[in-house]
C-alpha cells in the first residue's frame, strides 16, 4: 500500500509540474542575424523567470556549425507577465557582441523578441522548432 501511495504521489507531482510549464518554454528557431547566422534557442524556467540557451547554430547556407556561443545563455531574467508577455529581461546579440534590455511576446507558435537601447529596439520573430 505504501508503494502505491508513493507511486501515485510521484505521478501527481510529475503531472502538476508539466501542467505548470510556461507556454514559452521549448525550442525556438531564430531569424538570421546580421551575419546570416541563425540558431535554436532553448527556453526554460530559471527560478521564477525564463532564460534561453543557444543549443544549435546554422550558417547562411543552413548548415549546422560549431559556434563559439554554443551553450551560452542568450536570454535571461525574462519575467512572465501573463497573456504571452515577458518583460524586464536581457538578451545577448552574438552578431553585435552586445547585451540589451529585452522583452518577448508570445502569440501561438511565434515569439517576438526585442532588444532595446533607450527607445530604439531591434526585434526578431522566432518560430517554435521541433
Protein language model annotation of sequence segments:
Residues 1-7:
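Positively charged n-region of N-terminal signal peptides that target proteins for export
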Residues 7-15:
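Bacterial N-terminal signal peptides
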Residues 17-21:
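Sec/Tat signal peptide C-region and signal peptidase I cleavage site
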Residues 24-25, 29-100:
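Central antiparallel beta-sheet cores of small beta-barrel/beta-sandwich binding domains
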Residues 44-49, 105-111:
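Short, solvent-exposed coil/turn segments at beta-strand boundaries
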Residues 94, 101-104, 110-123:
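Short, exposed beta-strand-loop hairpins at the edges of beta-sheets
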Residues 129-130:
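Short, solvent-exposed mixed-charge patches
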Amino acid at each position: 500500500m505504501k508503494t502505491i501511495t508513493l507511486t501515485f504521489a510521484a505521478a501527481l507531482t510529475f503531472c502538476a509540474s508539466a501542467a505548470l510549464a510556461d507556454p514559452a518554454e521549448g525550442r525556438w528557431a531564430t531569424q538570421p542575424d546580421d551575419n546570416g547566422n541563425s540558431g535554436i534557442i532553448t527556453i526554460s524556467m530559471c527560478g521564477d523567470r525564463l532564460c534561453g540557451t543557444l543549443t544549435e547554430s546554422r550558417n547562411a547556407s543552413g548548415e549546422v556549425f560549431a559556434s563559439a556561443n554554443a551553450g551560452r545563455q542568450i536570454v535571461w531574467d525574462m519575467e512572465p507577465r501573463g497573456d504571452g508577455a515577458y518583460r524586464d529581461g536581457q538578451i545577448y546579440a552574438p552578431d553585435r557582441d552586445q547585451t540589451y534590455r529585452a522583452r518577448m511576446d508570445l502569440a501561438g507558435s511565434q515569439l517576438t523578441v526585442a532588444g532595446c537601447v533607450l527607445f530604439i529596439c531591434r526585434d526578431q520573430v522566432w518560430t517554435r522548432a521541433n
